[in-house]
Amino acid sequence: IPVRQCFTYKSTSKIKKGTRVTVPFGKKTLIGIVIKVSSISTSIVKTSAIKEIISVDDQYICFKKPLFNTLLWASEYYHHPIGEVFLSFLPSILRKQTNKSIINIDETSNYKINSADKNFDLTSEQKAALKKLKKIEEFNPTLIYGVTGSGKTEIYLRLVEKLVQEKKSVLILVPEINLVPQMLDRLKKRFDGEIGAYHSKLTPNQRFKIWLKSRLGGLKIV
């Protein structure tokens, strides 16, 4: 519910923070996000005028603790309606009421590295940059400077390789949508596993599937 305040509803079932729910709102039925859960006496719930949640719509929690807390902070810091903040982080398909169940997601892709695509030696500059970057174990913004064709992408691919071997996830951003096919082709040649491409030209269902599979840990390279 994209408004500035929160509303109280009751439920007889266990609900966790960050879950989508369907609730009555005036004469309408809307999608809401559980922001806080409080336990009160069952007798009070039955006799109170608090409206009841119609249904819990998720098989999982949409917003886990780190993201949940970040969105609460963003709403307060930027003085923006808390409902709009949470809504903006949901795929469009989850912002609407639907009778369809959440699509099933296959098991995690098994990523294998194709050595045939990297049968060449790195330059001394590439080796130095890669060695330094591999030592970084936490968030650290780093700029790799080089002219076009100097081999920056290969450094990125070697780093992706390292993270995939460590069972971690990788998010790769490209400056414009026209570069997606080129990067996707490079990644598919290097890794035998599903690569998720998420952009505005996909249908809502396609974007949702990639979002959900990434969210559940089944997609390691996006």
Language-model regions, residue ranges each:
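Accessory, non-ATPase domains that flank or precede helicase/AAA+ motor cores in DNA-metabolism machines
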Residues: 1-222
